[in-house]
Amino acid sequence: MKPLEKFLKKQTSQLAGRTVAGGPGGGLGSCGGPGGGGGPGGGGGPAGGQRSLQRRQSVSRLLLPAFLREPPAEPGLEPPVPEEGGEPAGVAEEPGSGGPCWLQLEEVPGPGPLGGGGPLRSPSSYSSDELSPGEPLTSPPWAPLGAPERPEHLLNRVLERLAGGATRDSAASDILLDDIVLTHSLFLPTEKFLQELHQYFVRAGGMEGPEGLGRKQACLAMLLHFLDTYQGLLQEEEGAGHIIKDLYLLIMKDESLYQGLREDTLRLHQLVETVELKIPEENQPPSKQVKPLFRHFRRIDSCLQTRVAFRGSDEIFCRVYMPDHSYVTIRSRLSASVQDILGSVTEKLQYSEEPAGREDSLILVAVSSSGEKVLLQPTEDCVFTALGINSHLFACTRDSYEALVPLPEEIQVSPGDTEIHRVEPEDVANHLTAFHWELFRCVHELEFVDYVFHGERGRRETANLELLLQRCSEVTHWVATEVLLCEAPGKRAQLLKKFIKIAALCKQNQDLLSFYAVVMGLDNAAVSRLRLTWEKLPGKFKNLFRKFENLTDPCRNHKSYREVISKMKPPVIPFVPLILKDLTFLHEGSKTLVDGLVNIEKLHSVAEKVRTIRKYRSRPLCLDMEASPNHLQTKAYVRQFQVIDNQNLLFELSYKLEANSQ
């Protein structure tokens, strides 16, 4: 399990899919590629030059830690080159079909999982509830749609079948609606999707009798499901909002035709109001309320607040530092571009009266605790959620770029007893689960699709997912930090014992995200090398930790983990990076479009994965948390960890504790 220590080395490069221009070599677990900032995959300080960020080129290579990836290709074999439109080349074809399977979805004859002798299984029917990258795509349970269709015609075909009742039962209709709504953005942009829906309803208005009525009812059903799924995500899409409003007015004109659908039209009215943001004037719109990003400010009242979902138009406070470590505090939209941020900094620095070109003389740089620097391009946006755990934004001139150094308090941590020595494992585990449930609930299910499939375009829609991934990395570094700051060998062994207890309790709470993060923190190379400390651990806890390592073992596509989570009932907090890995294999393992034709089986498999996430959150979390005298203090501690994310510094601390350990 040694590769576990490589988990989410650096959010700036791993989560955002960026190429980092680094300072000093990062070593294991630092920014850059597998070798860190100064190793293979990282920029090498001044020699690396000022390199811009390349975001999310491939989630399987950039987001996922090494232990989650598939084995490398054989020497001499070139990886598939993505074709125009972002689709990977070299997709396997269906035997005997002459090409990939598109819209004709029929059961393949013959024995085995691909053949007859039983119904085709959906991904959720596997023992793991997680789609294995090695499994074939699965056909949807609804009837075949017939001949291949282009994206602009597929929606019409689906609406025709809904209007004609060809799906035979309501369950198949619901799955059909859900598949198209969840995955339409893979082949049809949202605004285009709504335009097609609007045009279909207008054409149905010229038809007489049951046929026209059936088409309008199908259009109403599709719009309702679309709005019910997207809701808040559409609040920032002005073009989509106008189309929805026009379609809503058309439907309400024919309200008398929907006597049997009175509840649906009422629901439509409520949903459209949500999209249009009809908020009383005396209340400040949510998009204008300043929301705290954890780690930006350490005020107790902020970190104790229940987490709410972020949107691109939300405003936050953020510090932007100067080369001398002075700073200005700016108020900015979460989706603000680098150019907008520099404009706010320029105004704060009272440069506004200078010549117009003065703003362009400043650049924005993300500097990590290890000294690695990333030059941000003026057109980049949503940079706040892509920052690493201890990374900060610096505004400087190009001449002072090389002189930038990290803030001193981030690389000088005084050892000694911390809060972890005073709290009970049960309290820590429960607060971890409660906080991570809040963060997990904030992630819209479509953020997973946008993150994997849309890259740059989905940046502002994936802020909550990126914050959850950043938190997972933070917990991992917190475990390593606390162990390595404990100088007394006896206390250090007790701390290992406490963290193993916390991992066990998180697993009991069905919080597998925290469980994974704690185990990987203990498996950090700087911690696992402390042989003398581990020898002091009782045999019972050594055996328990071995079981945890086996559970997090990536062998056979994480078989142990998948078997455990398949037996859990909601609510469950899954190990989110593994969901992204599965979606990435779906994306890169088969094409969405070939010659303009839509691969329906891929859409259905992606939708099944999203429904798995929905299932995990289908019930509320209920923890038996007794209010202790230090309840708020423990809650604040768990939500605002102070960590060292510089792996070189962690190794230095480790060698000071046990210089000769192997």
UniProtKB/Swiss-Prot annotation:
Disulphide-bonded residues: none
Amino acid composition bias (Gly residues), ranges on this chain: 20-48
Entry annotated with the keyword rRNA processing: no
GO biological process: G protein-coupled receptor signaling pathway; nervous system development; Ras protein signal transduction
Pfam families on file: RasGEF
Biased composition (Pro residues): 73-82
Annotated gene: RAPGEFL1
Top-rank lineage group of the source organism: Eukaryota
UniProt name for this protein: Rap guanine nucleotide exchange factor-like 1
Molecular-function GO term, any one: guanyl-nucleotide exchange factor activity
GO CC annotation: membrane; plasma membrane
Compositional bias per record (Low complexity), positions renumbered to this chain: 49-64, 120-135
TM segment ranges: none
Role played: Probable guanine nucleotide exchange factor (GEF).
Record key words, sorted: Guanine-nucleotide releasing factor
Location of region: Disordered: 1-149
Location of the Ras-GEF domain: 424-660
